[in-house]
Amino acid sequence: MCKGLAGLPASCLRSAKDMKHRLGFLLQKSDSCEHSSSHSKKDKVVTCQRVSQEEVKKWAESLENLINHECGLAAFKAFLKSEYSEENIDFWISCEEYKKIKSPSKLSPKAKKIYNEFISVQATKEVNLDSCTREETSRNMLEPTITCFDEAQKKIFNLMEKDSYRRFLKSRFYLDLTNPSSCGAEKQKGAKSSADCTSLVPQCA
């Protein structure tokens, strides 16, 4: 027969109360994290709504012009993702970020992370490097410096320049941007034409 809460030992009541408090705290923490995460993502997103035709045309002059422009890089990355081959540009971006590290103590862990992700035999996003460059980069991991990925990054840049960059310039990801009528270009008196690229270049993170 149920005797109700009054019939339970004091220790059980304290345990139940403590458990309820913990569950309530965890639920509040979960809601708080989700709310914070959604705001964080919104803060990091920069929408590329307008890119001038002059800028878009410069992207066809060189791969360097393309990937050094925030929206150009986003468009190229979207193209590579559509081909399931974004590991090369991801590696290039990681190398650029690595070279900006100021603290010597942070070089080694970051270098190992890049190596394990893109260069090692069991890399999750292995890039296509020749054996000599791969071995040289492996040796550089013994004492990582700010330049330890320079040769590998150069090889991957050249590979993209000869292959995926040329395909990108022939793809709708680029051609639609060069056609003002296809991505909502607007011409105002005294202003240069620009393309609304929201649908083609959704985000420049």
From Swiss-Prot:
Keyword Transcription regulation: no
PROSITE patterns according to UniProt: RGS
CDD domains (alphabetical): RGS_RGS4
One of the record's GO cellular component terms: nucleus
Superkingdom as given in the UniProt entry: Eukaryota
Keywords: Lipoprotein, Palmitate, Phosphoprotein, Signal transduction inhibitor
Gene3D superfamilies from the UniProt entry: 1.10.196.10, Regulator of G-protein Signalling 4, domain 2
MF (Gene Ontology): G-protein alpha-subunit binding; GTPase activator activity; protein kinase binding
Annotated ranges, domain RGS: 62-178
Modification after translation: Either Cys-2 or Cys-12 or both are palmitoylated.
InterPro entries: RGS (IPR016137), RGS_RGS4 (IPR034953), RGS_sf (IPR036305), RGS_subdom1/3 (IPR024066), RGS_subdomain_2 (IPR044926)
Any one of the GO BP annotations: negative regulation of potassium ion transmembrane transport
Lipidation (S-palmitoyl cysteine): C2, C12, C95
PANTHER family for the chain: REGULATOR OF G PROTEIN SIGNALING, REGULATOR OF G-PROTEIN SIGNALING 4
Function: Inhibits signal transduction by increasing the GTPase activity of G protein alpha subunits thereby driving them into their inactive GDP-bound form. Activity on G(z)-alpha is inhibited by phosphorylation of the G-protein. Activity on G(z)-alpha and G(i)-alpha-1 is inhibited by palmitoylation of the G-protein.
Protein known as: Regulator of G-protein signaling 4
The organism of origin for this protein: Rattus norvegicus (Rat)
Classification lineage: Eukaryota, Metazoa, Chordata, Craniata, Vertebrata
Gene (name only): Rgs4
